[in-house]
């Protein structure tokens, strides 16, 4: 979420929804507490720890990374506040919860970014995926590989019906990641948000559980 920045730019994560509460109604009362760390062919997806403060300060402090995100580049205080949130985001127990995992290389342990899955609705079984790539490790498909694992968790672990991805419409590189995940572009919303002093367009992508399983 500029072509002059990372080759695989971050998708724009939404602000906190503030949704909480017990599940009631005619839908599954499921929770997702993954057995961390998760492993893919090349990556390890693990919980954040306070030891990640320096790397979070580094990559989230770069203007090219945050250009299409809601927040400004992190300073020391913002990085500390972020770590306080990130270390707690290890499970989805209620709507509004966020699962946010650090992504590292399995062979070397190098940090390559983070991915997140937000449980947006239990009643409608919906979620939202997001990611932020470390600009020193773009162009290798790491974000796509990690995000695919979170789609699997959302559909197979939490039994979601639909997962969306939202991004600044100027972020062509991030749109390509979503397309590689099999997500379809459903909307282009004109000047629907005022972010960092300007009206911005938003693109919306989505994938249904049956589409995910058919492509598996």
Positions of PLM-derived features:
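GNAT-family acyltransferases
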Residues: 2-136, 153, 157, 191, ...
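Conserved phosphate-binding and hydrolysis motifs of nucleotide-dependent enzymes
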Residues: 49, 113, 171, 180-182
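Conserved acetyl-CoA-binding loop of GNAT-fold acetyltransferases
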Residues: 179-189
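Short histidine
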Residues: 167, 174, 186, 198-201
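Conserved GNAT acetyl-CoA-binding A-motif
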Residues: 157-166
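Conserved acetyl-CoA-binding loop-helix of GNAT-fold acetyltransferases
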Residues: 131-133, 139-156, 172-180
């Amino acid at each position: 979420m500029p072509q002059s920045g990372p080759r695989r730019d971050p998708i724009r994560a939404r602000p906190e929804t503030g949704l909480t509460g017990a599940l009631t109604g005619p839908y599954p009362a499921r929770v997702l507490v993954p057995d961390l760390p998760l492993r893919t062919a090349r990556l390890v997806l693990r919980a954040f720890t306070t030891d990640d403060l320096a790397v979070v300060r580094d990559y989230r402090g770069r203007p090219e990374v945050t250009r299409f995100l809601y927040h400004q580049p992190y300073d020391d205080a913002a990085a500390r506040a972020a770590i306080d949130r990130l270390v707690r985001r290890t499970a989805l127990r209620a709507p509004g919860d966020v699962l946010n995992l650090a992504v590292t290389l399995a062979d070397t342990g190098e940090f390559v970014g983070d991915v997140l899955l937000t449980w947006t609705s239990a009643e409608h079984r919906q979620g939202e995926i997001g990611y932020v790539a470390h600009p020193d490790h773009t162009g290798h498909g790491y974000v796509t590989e990690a995000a695919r694992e979170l789609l699997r968790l959302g559909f197979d672990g939490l039994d979601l019906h639909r997962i969306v991805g939202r991004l600044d419409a100027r972020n062509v590189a991030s749109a390509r990641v979503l397309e590689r995940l099999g997500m379809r572009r459903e909307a282009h919303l004109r000047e629907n948000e005022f972010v960092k002093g300007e009206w911005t367009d938003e693109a919306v992508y989505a994938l249904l559980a049956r589409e995910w399983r058919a492509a598996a």
